Amino acid sequence: MSPQGPGTAVDVDDEVVLLDPDRRPCGTAPRLAVHGLDTPLHLAFSSYLFDAAGRLLVTRRALGKRTWPGVWTNSCCGHPRPGEDIALAVERRVDQELRLALTDLHCALPDFAYRATAADGLVENEVCPVYVARAVGDPDPDPAEVVEWRWVDWESYRQAALAAPWALSPWSVDQMTAFGQAAHPLTAALRAVG
């Protein structure tokens, strides 16, 4: 696992990959500087992690987070570093944020993108492939990143996104819509490669 200790800031000086309107890399920018009132399109990822029973790990963003503090969301999100394989970035970020190892990592929504504006005007503007994986064990989250976590039933979370979208992160709500009525996403991904 990561050498990071609880409460340790991670990736503070990371660069994110900027994208042109055709979603091609066109430069880099510091992660902390890129998110603002006029956030440029950039590359990110989201992940949905499941336990051995098929339950989804949902997390509540720490209250000190710059964007959407205290909001419930999918398992983990982040940004690949310039030149970094996105699947490896998912594994790196999950280890840093949740101190979890993964198996059966698959990209479920390779073309997902969204733009959302928070109540304070901060904008997310991301091409954000969505990954699913099986988590090994329970998380031990970095409190600077995650204030709470729960294992929940997939269908219950999908229904919550439909019934109370204001209670979840906007990207997670949009991703649940993109998953649609399909079967459990990890099962579907494993079946597709199997």
Curated annotation (Swiss-Prot):
Q: Cite the Gene3D superfamilies for this sequence.
A: Nucleoside Triphosphate Pyrophosphohydrolase
Q: Where is the active site?
A: C77, E126
Which chemical reaction does it catalyze?
isopentenyl diphosphate = dimethylallyl diphosphate
Q: Where does Mn(2+) bind?
A: H35, H42, H79, E124, E126
**Its domain of life?**
Bacteria
Mention one GO biological process in which this protein takes part, according to its record.
isoprenoid biosynthetic process
Q: Where in the cell is it found?
A: Cytoplasm
Chief subcellular location: cytoplasm
Summarizing the function annotation, the protein's role is: Catalyzes the 1,3-allylic rearrangement of the homoallylic substrate isopentenyl (IPP) to its highly electrophilic allylic isomer, dimethylallyl diphosphate (DMAPP).
PANTHER family in alphabetical order: ISOPENTENYL-DIPHOSPHATE DELTA-ISOMERASE
Family statement: Belongs to the IPP isomerase type 1 family.
| Protein name (Swiss-Prot/TrEMBL) | Isopentenyl-diphosphate Delta-isomerase
